[in-house]
Amino acid sequence: MPFTRILAVFVVVAAGLSGRIESASESASPARTDIEQQQAPSWSKDDLNFFLHGSMSTEVVPESVLRAFIKTYPDLFPSSDLSHLGLILDKDFGWPIGLSRKNVQHLGGMPAVGINCASCHVAQISSISRPQPIQILGVTGHFDVESFFGSVLVATFKTSDPENMKRFLRNYVSDTGKVHGDHAETAVSSAWKKQEEKIVAAMKTDPFGGKDVAPGELHKIEPAEVKLDIKSLEKGDVDLAARVHSMLKLFHNMRTTLHVPDKPPDKVPPASGPGRNDAFGLLSASLLNMPQPYSPIKFGLVWNVDKRIWVHWDGNTKSPIARNLLASLGLGAPMHGKRGDLIFADVKRQTDLSEKIAPPKYPFSLDNDAAKRGAPLFANNCNSCHGGPESDTRLHAVAEVGTDPHRAEMFTQKLADGFNKFLVELESEGYQAPKEYGVRSTGKYWAATLSGVWARSPYLHNGSVRTMHELLTSPDQRAKTFHRGSRVFDEKEMGYTDDGAYVLDTAGSGNSNSGHDYGTKLSENEKRDLIEYLKTL
């Protein structure tokens, strides 16, 4: 069925594949650090706040619904603050960095949350020598984005069961009415008992809320239809069966904006884990209805983007606004035919800000003598691919590099044509269709400039090599599995420590750690010198 592929990726959590991630320190709103100021010196405080929490029109779940889900399904949401997803807490905002808030009409006018660039491109790291977390912009983050959306979607399906709906409503009333849980439970249970037969019949007739609307279309939901307060329940002024049906329609709208059908999939693919997803696989399925083989990649790096012509691991996109429009429309901004329902100015502002982020300077101690010895090693082993002009000479065939071929092979010319056609036909207020195509297929991998390479762990496009020292090790001697989720930086090995709940198995589809054997024949001392030099870039 259409779009089953994208749903399958999102609901990996349903198969118990999601693991708890090491959480950040529970601080208030992060103060602007020296490293952030170095990375984005032209940003104002408002710019920083907008990058961290500004809307991209992806708000997909009402806050009150999300809080009720968190209380109702602790198996899906092990932490109430979402820290289990690898997000950075921000108590002043109320939700972690990378989450936005906006009132959404098709969600009953309620304040809802979605994600923006910062959810995937901001991270905190520490080390044994410097335990205080350092916040970095534009880096590969630790967010388990699949588990976030998977948990929300699975919760909508689970709440189509009457008993689960009753539990959900108790928590929903408790949150929206700001009343004690026991008080809400008594009120909901009493009202439910009076209308139970009617409620169950309504849920059986339309369990997923999509009966009265065409596939892919949204219900119009007025605020009063999803309002549920303790006083009205106790007075008997509420048609609870009607409220339940409105909630099911709300869940339908949530799924529809994520291009997910009102039916769970029969099977799911493997979980990509923190800091990774199958980005173009999701977008090709959701926006083009062109499902692709599973091809996990780590989140890209948003540094010096203004100096690049083509971006992404295969150099397939040259339009900055296009890539963020695709992300917004794939992750919650509604589509009505060819019209994208989003605030273009907000997406453009996020895009413009991301263009101004510089790579972070190495924040830990450095062996300058070793770095000097490493400079010629870099020139002889790395610079021929990773240096020089930003041109297509940076593209290298999979056979030449030897790394996992899935990502390069999946982005075909047919797929590029599909995205170009989509962007030309897209309508949205303020958006002007490109005069020339900005998406292409290369079938190769791009050798990016290595500025900030110290912070790019895990390495390779699919994040299959944990540290730089291991990347300089012969592929057949690299670890076959390692853990993801740690925020502790190993200064000696140059990468995150082998900790966290998620296990990356390099034998899995798209996860190969083969290839890129450059520098593997250096002596151990030479490797250490080269690593020290790389920290200076």
Question: Predicted segment positions?
Answer:
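Bacterial N-terminal signal peptides
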Residues: 7-16
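Positively charged n-region of N-terminal signal peptides that target proteins for export
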Residues: 1-5
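Periplasmic c-type cytochrome electron-transfer domains
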Residues: 25-537
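Signal peptide processing junction and immediate N-terminal pro/mature segment
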Residues: 17-27
